[in-house]
């Protein structure tokens, strides 16, 4: 199977190389060459388990030995606390797809428990070593660290914005065990970290200094991170059919809290594979660059970066949008390169009227302020005794404003206990207390179970204390890599 760059159709790579490389050498993202020919047969999936469906989806994207692919899928999802992996919960106004039952209580686990196994399959028979570089707005970092911990032939360095993640998210990363893991805070925001990591990927001099080690990514720019996320859209649909909520072939809606555009792009890819989807709704917080883009066709990152109570969505540069635009433009690599060049040079671009019409046909959009987010957390708890985290609450608020036809699924991306300060403030009207005390009080009041991985977090040893300026990240990598040997 071949993948090509969104910015140059002549740059093609075998699937294993695209997976290991993460980002094309021209800065483009890898997309499957014959993706439009790929389809799934939903009828044949009705009696399948989550892991069975994952296998049927992933074999469309990777040419691994099928028995080995099945085996690593089973291993990855055995780490979840429920056999359903991503259970569906019915509320009054929508179904909530719980994506937080993995080892780090965030939706990133769905892909990042599997990605290390996929990389190991791609490395079979090779002495190649991979250095995973990851920028995180909170959840990707811990999920990637946990996934790659002590995995042979890999090392991982995670960068996060020092004041841009919640205390629990930071502690999850700074207490990370594993002889091949490094964590470093940067002075700046997530966009600064992500842009710097992308530039480092393209730094040939730095790559030479690393010798046999090659860079790869655990962010959703890596096709191996993105493709496993397609699975839970299909599984949610199948569950609705099994539960007699819809008939096979009925169209449904998905509302997705979105920052980097990876999660909602996975839904778009599921639709392209044949999933009956009416609308994909992009839900943003006050960093609503995507809302503006989907309504006007103008992408403009030249605005104030706002810190919100949904920090994993505090993003102004949505990397995976490039893959969507490549698809909507009919694989017009030159057009995509021109847009990305405009974004780099001027911080903005405008798509043509044809693409804007397609965007409006495929996607709904909306956004929520912090006050509106808190109100929804309180409202849903009081009315349904269901506890939302702030990111899911953003999506729920946007869902309530949409005039959607058919059943609707809201993607729930994290355990509410990862954001105790915001959730306790909304539900209990308590502020200015230690997050772990708030966790206890929230549990006492709601009786919602606290995930095992979060219970003893405050008693774990701090192992990572590094802090650098964004312009020193490349230098840090060289120093950190010596420590990881």
Describe each model-derived feature in a short phrase.
Residues 1-485:
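PLP-dependent amino-acid enzyme catalytic core
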């Amino acid at each position: 199977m071949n993948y090509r760059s969104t910015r140059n159709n002549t740059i093609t790579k075998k699937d294993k190389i695209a997976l290991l490389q993460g980002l094309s050498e021209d800065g483009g993202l890898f997309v499957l060459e014959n993706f439009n020919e790929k389809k799934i047969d939903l009828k044949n999936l009705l009696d399948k388990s989550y892991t069975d469906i994952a296998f049927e989806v992933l074999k469309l994207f990777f040419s691994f030995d099928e028995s080995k692919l099945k085996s690593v899928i089973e291993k990855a999802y055995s780490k979840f606390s429920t056999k359903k992996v991503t259970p569906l919960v019915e509320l009054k106004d929508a179904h909530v797809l719980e994506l937080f039952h993995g080892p780090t209580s965030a939706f990133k686990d769905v892909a990042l428990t599997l990605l290390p196994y996929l990389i190991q399959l791609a490395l079979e028979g090779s002495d190649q070593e991979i250095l995973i570089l990851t920028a995180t707005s909170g959840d990707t970092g811990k999920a990637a660290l946990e996934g790659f911990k002590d995995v042979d032939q890999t090392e991982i360095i995670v960068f996060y914005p020092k004041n841009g993640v919640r205390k629990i998210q930071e502690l999850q990363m700074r207490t990370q065990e594993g002889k091949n893991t490094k964590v470093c805070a940067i002075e700046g925001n997530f966009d600064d970290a992500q842009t710097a990591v992308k530039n480092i990927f393209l730094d040939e001099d730095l790559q030479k200094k690393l010798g046999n080690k090659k860079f790869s990514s655990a962010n959703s720019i890596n096709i191996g991170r993105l493709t496993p996320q397609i699975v839970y859209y299909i599984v949610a649909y199948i569950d609705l059919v099994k539960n007699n909520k819809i008939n096979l072939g009925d169209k449904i809606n998905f509302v997705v809290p979105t920052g980097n555009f990876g999660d909602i792009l996975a839904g778009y890819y599921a639709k392209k594979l044949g999933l009956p989807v009416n609308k994909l709704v992009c839900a943003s917080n006050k960093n609503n660059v995507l809302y503006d883009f989907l309504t006007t066709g103008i992408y403009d990152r030249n605005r104030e970066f706002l810190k919100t109570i949904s920090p994993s969505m505090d993003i102004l540069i949505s990397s995976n949008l490039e893959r969507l635009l490549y698809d909507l433009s009919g694989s017009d690599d030159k057009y995509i390169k021109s847009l990305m060049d405009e974004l780099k040079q001027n911080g903005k671009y405008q798509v043509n009227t044809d693409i804007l019409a397609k965007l409006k046909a495929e996607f709904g959009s909306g956004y929520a302020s912090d006050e509106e987010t808190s109100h929804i957390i309180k409202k849903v708890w009081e009315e349904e005794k269901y506890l939302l985290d702030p990111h899911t609450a953003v999506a729920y608020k946007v869902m309530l404003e949409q005039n959607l036809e058919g059943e609707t699924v809201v993607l729930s991306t994290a355990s509410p206990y990862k954001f105790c300060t915001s959730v306790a403030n909304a539900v209990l009207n308590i502020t200015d207390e230690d997050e772990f005390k708030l966790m206890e009080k929230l549990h006492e009041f709601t009786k919602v179970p606290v995930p095992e991985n979060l219970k003893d977090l405050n008693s774990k040893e701090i192992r990572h204390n590094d802090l650098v300026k964004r312009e020193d990240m490349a230098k840090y990598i060289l120093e950190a890599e010596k420590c990881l040997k």
